[in-house]
Amino acid sequence: MTFSLELSEEQQELRDWVHGFAEQTIRPAAREWDEREETPWPIIQEAAKIGLYGFETLATFWADDTGLSLPIANEELFWGDGGIGMAIFGTTLAVAGIFAAGTPDQLAEWVPQCYGDVDDPKVAAFCSSEPGAGSDVSAMRTRAVYDEAKDEWVLNGQKAWATNGGIANVHVVQAVVDPELGSRGQAAFVVPPGTKGLESPSKIKKHGLRASHTADVFLDDVRVPGSCLLGGKEKLDERLARSREGTKASSQAAMKTFELSRPAVGAQAVGIARAAYETALEYAQQRETFGRPIIENQSIAFTLADMRMEIDAARLLVWRAAWLGRNGGFTAGEGSMSKLKAGRVATWATERAIQILGGNGYTREFPVERMHRDAKIYDIFEGTEQIQQLVVARAISGKHIA
């Protein structure tokens, strides 16, 4: 398939549909839910009612051979608000984990339970990071031990910074099954609703994305059926055997999930950056000093020109990465490039927007201060800025740069 910048009619309709929901439903509620620092369940339910939140829509996104539907939708969703956008999108991280490693039967069983239904929507959590294992996935300490007599896996450990952790209907947990193999000795498990031993005492108070629930998750002798091992035990045993023999094994589920999500996450940052740019542009056209709109001053106009240029460049990198992910794969760390660039642009553009608004930009009466707080996380999660640079550096050099 040829890469094209011309959106299909269906993609344009998708963009307009999500934009309409973001403009009419998300934006008017953004400040309230940011200040409440609570999951916006009424908005999630509204998204479910129109079909925006649910597996059917996500499946439609993933069925797009161009790979662009999810980034297009994400940009509009997060243009509405980063925190509410993540409250709606967060479940996708867990679903991506199930898709990366699960069997068709597991997908059919667990993905619908991640979303619930229109009358009773649910959320799901992907639990990979730990207090001592963020960027360094090989440092993971959560263990999964197989109880052959009962055909159950017993999970013990602590997960950190889990989106929807504790409030999720379904938790997808990454754990070590063979410590001697490092990151190659890991597997992913579904923890069903109501499983004993999974606790999340409190949520984490965050700098930004406050409408999205983030928490540590504790696993104390959590027992799950053997069928909850994503991919199944036979496949796991084969992979572990290849690793012990020193032959190449496929990437673990956590890394597959990150690979699937980076262009989509980059699109979120583009949406936040665009929202800040548009706010600053409108303000600069209306705000007058010294008898004229401030946009007529070169310093302001040039800043806005740079903002528009950088946002468009970031979007193009995101679209290229999304397309490559579906058509041939990455050769030079393009997925990491897209997220790295988009994250940098988001933090820079939101800061510039505050500067253009001056004192008003520093207050909560205007949305750019919230956008700035929301943007910072894109330099950190789903792979820090430095890890993204490392991925690209290794890809272009062919060397294992530490």
Where are these regions (language model features)?
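FAD-binding core of FAD-dependent oxidoreductases
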Residues: 81-96, 118-129, 158-171
